[in-house]
Amino acid sequence: DMADVLKSEQLLARDWFRSLSVAGKTFSAPGAPYKLSRTPCTHLSASEAVGASTDLMLDDSFPWPIHENIVTKKCETQETNKSNGPLAGLRVIEVTANWAGPIAGRHFADLGADVIKIELDTKPATRALAYVPADIWPDHYHRSGYFNKLNRNKRAICLNLATTKGRSLFLKLIESVDVVLENNAARVMKQLGLSY
């Protein structure tokens, strides 16, 4: 029940809600998803009507709020050198689903490990979510921001671990890895004949 959310002791203690007024009505709205002490979130005012701020948002001269503690500089593009990371030389096979497993694999990869994600072509998982923008071409399988966020810096291979060939290739791959990362339901790996 949303009324319970508005009474949440945790959210109230964190001063999470903000007050908004729209069309003469004032109500509580969600605040920022996280708080940073040196660079707090700056909320824009609520619009009185749908589309009321469109011209303003599209105006290149709009003075977007920048906190005084932010130091701005031109970012230079550089190639990531994974061999410099603290986990360089570590090899990880990732057989994960949803969010927690892929984000753990991403942390390994971001820190320099060679992470190989096992994907199933019949279940593209988060690859199928939200194309940005709405068109699905070309290379629609590369267009999910959610998938890209969770799987950056990884390599991938499609293997169906339910088949003899897929399982055989997987077992060959894990001979050369240091870590097998998986977060499936407890029965899944065992049913695939890949239990510990």
Residue ranges and their predicted role:
Residues D1-L44:
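A glycine-rich dinucleotide-binding beta-alpha-beta segment and adjacent secondary-structure elements
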Residues L20, S45, A49, S53-Y196:
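N-terminal helix-loop segment corresponding to the beta1-alpha1 unit
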